[in-house]
């Protein structure tokens, strides 16, 4: 029997590939990973179930990170599909799942799809001109991680663009509830372009290494791959007050731009009052 790990792409239920759709149709159970990304726009679990004509089981953080025992056991007897928004290998969790399956001698077939890592080309910056991608997590009163700053610095020195993947908090517990063993979860939170810029500038103010400033050119994107996709370019200062709408958001710190990239950049330039 086979464990299929299937990318759903970035849009709605119809973004699944034909190969992925066929695997879903012949699987006895369908799981949807529901915490490293978000289904596009107004797409609901019900919409997926109607399109696939299959019942979908939500695989939350606890289930996936605890080893997916139930799903793996099922895969030893029947074909099972594990659905991932974007591409299957957009998160290390899914790599770990493949390793677990191989340890149990369960055949794994991965069916790829579009992810933010390649769809980001929609902004006009050439994919081979990107440096290291960084993840920007929500700051707290006590924690302000800045290890990403050094990677941005390397990218900037080399004239490379930096893609910033913005934090998602789904089914997260507060420290108090975690310590007390209470399964009470915080409301979902999705970092915005504005919050990302604020945190970038805050760390620059602390580190003072002049890696970037409020006049650095950048691009904010929201809902990439969906019908209401939004792309706006400008300086950090200009984008700080732009409303990018509903999640998911992504952010790019521009490096040195080819003249064609510059032309494309200007087509998305923020409108000034």
Swiss-Prot record:
EC number assigned by the record: 2.1.1.314
UniProtKB keywords: Methyltransferase, S-adenosyl-L-methionine, Transferase
Top EC class for this record: transferase
Binding-site residues for S-adenosyl-L-methionine, renumbered to this chain:
10, 87, 90, 115-116, 166, 224, 249
- Gene Ontology MF terms in the entry: diphthine methyl ester synthase activity; transferase activity
What's a BP term from Gene Ontology annotated to this protein? Answer: methylation
One GO cellular component assignment for this chain's record is:
plasma membrane
Name this polypeptide is given: Diphthine methyl ester synthase
Classification from the root reads: Eukaryota, Amoebozoa, Evosea, Eumycetozoa, Dictyostelia
Q: Tell me the organism.
A: Dictyostelium discoideum
């Amino acid at each position: 029997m086979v464990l299929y790990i299937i990318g759903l792409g970035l849009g709605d239920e119809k973004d699944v590939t034909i190969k992925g759709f066929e695997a879903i149709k012949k699987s006895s159970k369908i799981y949807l990973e529901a915490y490293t990304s978000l289904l596009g726009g107004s797409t609901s679990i019900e919409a997926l179930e109607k399109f696939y004509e299959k019942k979908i089981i939500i695989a939350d953080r606890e289930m996936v990170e605890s080893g997916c025992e139930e799903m793996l056991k099922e895969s030893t007897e029947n074909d099972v599909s594990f659905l991932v928004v974007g591409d299957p290998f957009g998160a290390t969790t899914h790599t770990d799942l493949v390793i677990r399956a191989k340890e149990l001698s369960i055949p794994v077939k991965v069916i790829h799809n579009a992810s933010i890592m390649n769809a980001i080309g929609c902004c006009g910056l050439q994919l081979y001109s990107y440096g290291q991608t960084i993840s920007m997590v929500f700051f707290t009163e006590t924690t302000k991680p800045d290890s990403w700053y050094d990677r941005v610095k390397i990218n900037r020195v080399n004239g490379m663009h930096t893609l910033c993947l913005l934090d998602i908090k789904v089914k997260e517990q507060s420290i108090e509830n975690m310590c007390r063993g209470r399964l009470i979860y915080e409301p979902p939170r999705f970092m915005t372009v504005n919050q990302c810029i604020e945190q970038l500038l805050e760390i620059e103010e602390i580190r003072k290494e002049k890696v970037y400033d409020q006049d650095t050119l950048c691009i904010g994107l929201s809902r990439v791959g969906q019908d209401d996709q939004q792309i706006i370019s400008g300086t950090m200062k200009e984008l700080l007050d732009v409303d990018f709408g509903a999640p998911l958001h992504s952010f790019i710190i521009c490096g040195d731009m080819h003249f064609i990239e510059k032309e494309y950049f200007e087509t998305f330039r923020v409108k000034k009052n």
